């Protein structure tokens, strides 16, 4: 029988199977022998050992479309990164670090600013929101008032989406809104997963509707860019790409060079000043890291 790994704790893998049940499984020894580690999000073949106890064995991992390093998850279609408009105030540099990590791994990202009822939309628009200026689709939501929920549901439908963001921004509220009726049907998932002590520190997959899955990840308060040279950084700011052909120098870093298409676009308000300032800060951070 086929299914998806929705959680892995202490050598046990919890599989959401085709029959709608969740099976607690051990992986066969061949995976250890081959030094292969199943990941949350993997599609798997299982053999059922005890139907009543819902226990089984993972016999095969089906080919992965992709896999992320942070968070460690397989077969992801997109990332949905949530920050609050207020309480806590958005940390834009932290947001940009996350977006760069997704760009590095080739995963499209959508930005959600939650708690719309608390924030000043005009201020956020000035800083960040206009999509051509930040290079990403942006959604405003309020779980309190039900705003933006239908739009989010459309964005997530039919995909496996990593949901990420700092603690306290309303990630779990949005996830609960998305689950709707399926919360009743997958109550067994909740019961099974409560067996582990470490549930909040691990990523888990939540089935939302047919072919729609959310990968709930632990909240983050800091992220560090690794395995990157400072001259690569510009490749991970998608809004720069449109203006780079206007740069006089090939390999322009968009910092001190004359006749820079990106800096001209910035001066004309076509690129977010906030994003550009974060680019400069991260460029210096990577340069310092290389020095040591």
PLM features: residue spans?
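Structural detector for short beta-strands of small beta-barrel domains
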Residues: 1-9
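Helix-rich effector regions associated with P-loop NTPase G domains
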Residues: 11, 29, 35-52, 62-78, ...
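SH3/SH3-like beta-barrel fold
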Residues: 13-17, 25, 46
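Short, structured beta-strand/loop micro-motifs enriched in basic residues and often containing a Trp
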Residues: 21-30
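Short, Lys/Arg- and Gly-enriched loop/turn segments at beta-strand edges
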Residues: 51-61, 89-91
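Phosphate-binding glycine-rich loops and their immediate beta-loop-alpha structural context
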Residues: 86-134
């Amino acid at each position: 029988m086929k299914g998806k790994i929705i959680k892995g704790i202490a050598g046990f893998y919890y599989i959401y199977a085709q029959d709608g049940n969740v099976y607690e499984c051990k992986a066969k020894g061949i995976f250890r022998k081959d030094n292969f580690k199943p990941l949350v999000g993997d599609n798997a073949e299982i053999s059922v050992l005890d139907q009543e106890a819902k226990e089984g064995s993972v016999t095969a991992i089906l080919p992965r479309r992709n896999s992320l390093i942070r968070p460690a998850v397989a077969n992801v279609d997109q990332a949905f990164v949530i920050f609050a408009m207020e309480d806590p105030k958005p940390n834009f540099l932290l947001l940009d670090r996350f977006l760069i990590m997704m760009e590095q791994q080739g995963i499209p990202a959508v930005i959600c600013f939650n708690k719309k009822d608390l924030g000043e939309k005009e201020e956020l628009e000035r800083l960040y929101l206009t999509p051509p200026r930040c290079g990403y689709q942006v959604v405003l939501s309020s779980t309190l008032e039900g705003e933006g929920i239908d739009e989010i549901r459309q964005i997530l439908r039919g995909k496996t989406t990593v949901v990420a963001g700092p603690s306290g921004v309303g990630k779990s509220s949005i996830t609960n809104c998305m689950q709707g009726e399926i919360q009743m049907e997958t109550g067994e998932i909740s019961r099974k997963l409560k067996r582990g002590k470490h549930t909040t520190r691990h990523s888990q997959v939540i089935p939302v509707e047919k072919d729609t899955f959310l990968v709930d990840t632990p909240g983050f308060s800091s992220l560090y860019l690794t395995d990157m040279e400072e001259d690569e950084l510009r490749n991970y700011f998608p809004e720069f790409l449109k203006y780079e052909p206007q740069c006089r120098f090939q390999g322009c870093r968009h910092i001190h060079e004359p006749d820079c298409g990106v800096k001209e676009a910035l001066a004309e308000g076509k690129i977010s000043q906030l994003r550009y300032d974060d680019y400069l800060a991260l460029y210096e951070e990577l340069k310092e890291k290389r020095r040591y």
